[in-house]
Amino acid sequence: MTVQDLPVVNATLNAISTCFIVGGIIFIKRGKKTEAQIRDGFLCNNSKFHEEKLLHAVCMITALIVSAAFLTCYLIYHYSYPTTKFTHEGWPKIIYFIILFTHIPLAILSLPLIILTVIPAIRRKFEKHKRFARWTYPVWLYVSVTGVLVYLMLYVWFPATGTQ
């Protein structure tokens, strides 16, 4: 593998991160439902609730590690190669730049948001964690999905002449 292979690696890491972000949200929402059932007397055993919280944590930690790997590969690639230009005209170019110009500022915002969300979770301050997560989750998910879309538009659907 060479540095030239990093765009596909980056897209793959973003796609994997997306899956774990979605999985983490599904598990925490299922955990909330289980918690409500325990509170309302429908369930007496809270082991299911703790299992869902643990699965949420595993998914989110995995998403964080995969995203950190992505950021490392992204910085290596962009340090080594110039920016790839989108060369198509018409509606593909309009859609590409709409996606790109929303992706970039949200990607920049996502790093501090993720940090501000993870730190309270590590410190077991879950109310503060939830307050930040309400903002972090949609931003992180959007950035992960649009990162894959940017790759697909640049290298697969509308590649410049001479690219793969």
Where are these regions (language model features)?
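Alpha-helical membrane insertion/targeting regions
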Residues: 1-164
